[in-house]
Amino acid sequence: MSDSSHNLLYNKFELPESVKMSPVEGAVGGIDKVARFVADPLEKGMGHTLGSALRRALLIGLEAPAIVSFSMTGVLHEYMAVEGIIEDVTNIVLNLKGSLLKKYPLQDCEGGRCSQKLRATISIDASDLAAAGGQKEVTLGDLLQEGTFEAVNPEHVIFTVTRPMQLEVMLRVAFGRGYSPSERIVLEERGMNEIVLDAAFSPVVLVNYFVEDTRVGQDTDFDRLVLQVETDGRVAPKEAVAFATQILSKHFSVFEKMDEKRIVFEEAISVEKENKDDILHKLVLGINEIELSVRSTNCLSNANIETIGELVIMPEPRLLQFRNFGKKSLCEIKNKLKEMKLELGMDLSQFGVGLDNVKEKMKWYAEKIRLSKNTKG
C-alpha cells in the first residue's frame, strides 16, 4: 500500500461521463453485429491513443468458440466423397469453417480451458427426402443436439443428403484467439478419422475509428473518439468493446506496478455539484473585488473583463491572446479561481450564459441578487 506522501497531484483530465452507443444505418444484422461508439470530451491526442489501442485489442485479443475438428460416419479423410452426399469432404470442411457458435456463460474445465465434443445423430428417411424435393439439407442447427453452445447461424448448410441414411457426426469445439491453422491445433485423444480444421476464433470482423474536434464550454481544443465495430455475432459489439477494455487494463496494470507513486487527479469543477446561488454570487463579483496583482488586474481591465463570470467563461488559450497577458498572470488567476472553487473555461450554459451575452447576463444577475437582498432586508 503506497503512502499518501508518495501521491502526485495532476491537473484534471476531461473525461466522458459515459460512452454513447448507436446503431449504424443500413448495417446488416443490426446493433447486435454493428455499432458505433462515441466518447467525448477527451484531452487532445487521447482520441488517437485510445482509438488505436482499442482497435488492436479488438482485432487480436478477443476469444470465441470455433469448430476445430470433426468426424462423420464413412469419412476417412478430407480428400474423398461420401455416397449419398452432394458435397465432397473438402466442401464439408469449408462449410464447417463458416459455422458460428457462442456459449454463455463461459465454463472452464478442470486445469484450464479445454475442447468439447458435440455429438449428433442424423437420420434421414425416404419421407424426409420426399418432403425436401429429393435433397435434404443438413444445417448447423441440426448438428447441435447437445451441449450448451448456440448457433449464431443455425440455417447454415453443412451438407446435402440425396438418399436415406443415418450418420453419426462429432464436432469438437474449442476456444481461442485470432486465427489458428490446422497444423497448430493440438487435440487431446484425437480419433483415428478425426479431421482437424483451420479455426477462426476472432469474433471481430472490422474496426474503424476516427477523431473529431469537440468543445468543453467555449474551448474547442478537445477530441471526440468515434469507434465503429462489426462482429460476426458470436460476441455483440458492446461486449467486444468492454472485453477489449478489460484486456488493455490487465496489460497496463503490469506497468503501473513499476513505481509506488500514485497520481491524484484534480476533479473537474461541476456547477451542478455546487449550490447555484453560491456560484452566481461569485460570478457577479467584480475583478477588483478579488485579490489580484495590479498587473493581472490591469491586463483583465484592458481586455474589458469586468466580472468573475466574464473571466471563468474564457478558455485558457484565449486569455493568453490578450495583450501583455503572460503565463505569470495566468498562473495567478488560476490559483485565485481555484480558491473560489472555480476554473477557466467553465460551461455556464445552465445559467443561460455564453460568450456572446456574458456581460449582459452578469449585470442582470447582479441586479437580481441586489433586489433579492433588499427584499429580504
Curated annotation (Swiss-Prot):
SUPFAM superfamilies: C-terminal domain of RNA polymerase alpha subunit (SSF47789), Insert subdomain of RNA polymerase alpha subunit (SSF56553), RBP11-like subunits of RNA polymerase (SSF55257). Pfam families: RNA_pol_A_bac (PF01000), RNA_pol_A_CTD (PF03118), RNA_pol_L (PF01193). GO terms for molecular function: DNA binding; DNA-directed RNA polymerase activity; protein dimerization activity. Residues 276-377 are annotated as: Alpha C-terminal domain (alpha-CTD). It catalyses: RNA(n) + a ribonucleoside 5'-triphosphate = RNA(n+1) + diphosphate. GO terms for biological process: DNA-templated transcription. This is DNA-directed RNA polymerase subunit alpha. Keywords: DNA-directed RNA polymerase, Nucleotidyltransferase, Transcription, Transferase. Signal peptide: none annotated. The gene is rpoA. It comes from Chlamydia trachomatis serovar A (strain ATCC VR-571B / DSM 19440 / HAR-13). Belongs to the RNA polymerase alpha chain family. NCBIfam families: PRK05182.1-2, PRK05182.2-3, PRK05182.2-5, rpoA. One of its GO terms (cellular component) is DNA-directed RNA polymerase complex. DNA-dependent RNA polymerase catalyzes the transcription of DNA into RNA using the four ribonucleoside triphosphates as substrates. It is an enzyme of class 2 (transferase).
